[in-house]
Amino acid sequence: MSFCIFNFVFRKFDCITFAFFFRVSEYNLVINDIDPQGNFGLNWSFEGQGAIPRYASFFADPLEFSASLILFFSTAIWFFIHSKLRETKFLSLFLVLVIVFSFFLSFSRASMFSAILTLVFGLYLSKNYKIILSSLFIVTVGFLYVYFFSSDDLRYLIQDTITFQNTSSLGHLIEWIEGLISIYENPFGVGLAMSGNASGVDQSIKIGGENQFLIYGVQMGVISMVIYFLILIKSIYNSSKLYLNSNNINHKSVGFITALTKFGLLIPLFTANAELYLFVAFFSWYLVGQSERLYNTKL
């Protein structure tokens, strides 16, 4: 998280980010044959509406950074809820605040909304129902304050996002429609490397790509898409059961963090090719494997 703060300071005072420092634009040009784009010479994901900069720390882009924050957020919630020492609770709360600050720096609306749902789900699993109501009240008041008393630019951004008039939101909608049409016409798929943002996909002929479920559906058909969705639901369910029924605090932590991480990644999966985010994808599936092992052998 310190990298994110360092990145923010770097940008404000020296007008550079880690992406500039490590010459990411040159890497994309030479290795991926992608020309620099946007007002910052990187790609369009590094800026929001009105050329507002978005930060990625040392990750490939802000979307991957924000998705990875879900994992850290889930871990911080675990320590905050289950720590018995006051010092540890304060440290966990500080970590939560740093992560929330990082969400704003990455400015991924899907991940920020997902973080709220992750918090509610974590409090529900741990049976902190009063805190859920308090949190929802605070979030609602905060949203209403931002919507009615913030700058016009931010208010218009919220309106355009909800009504799909924002360029990014409209792009998602178009990609979803393309994917759904392809699945309807080809229910058994059109083949691999035909959808998504992976380097092996020819962007000139790709179909859809802003929804992980539709990407699998376009490429491998409806059956594969449904199986992938059921695997996610089953992993969340089994991890939750592991947390609720285990008597070992270490096993409970694995179940809790796994359930929250996979639950929190559902929204990013609906808006991006999120399985390409290697760090959070590999680590979260590793946690699923550990959770399933404990669920089948220890309960």
Model-predicted segments: where are they?
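Long extracytoplasmic/lumenal interhelical loops at the membrane interface
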Residues: 53, 149-220, 239-245
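Alpha-helical transmembrane segments of multi-pass inner-membrane proteins
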Residues: 1-29, 33-107, 112-125
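Transmembrane alpha-helices of multi-pass, membrane-embedded glycan-processing enzymes
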Residues: 4-7, 66-69, 218, 224-237
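Aromatic-anchored segments of alpha-helical transmembrane domains
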Residues: 7-9, 99-102, 140-147, 262-271
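A membrane-periplasm/extracellular boundary helix in multi-pass inner-membrane enzymes
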Residues: 9-21, 106, 123-163, 180-184
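Hydrophobic transmembrane alpha-helices and their immediate junctions
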Residues: 80-81, 86-92, 98-100, 116-124, ...
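Short, aromatic-rich membrane-interface segments at the entry and exit
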Residues: 88-91, 110-112, 130-135, 228, ...
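Transmembrane alpha-helices of multi-pass inner-membrane enzymes
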Residues: 74, 116-120, 258-299
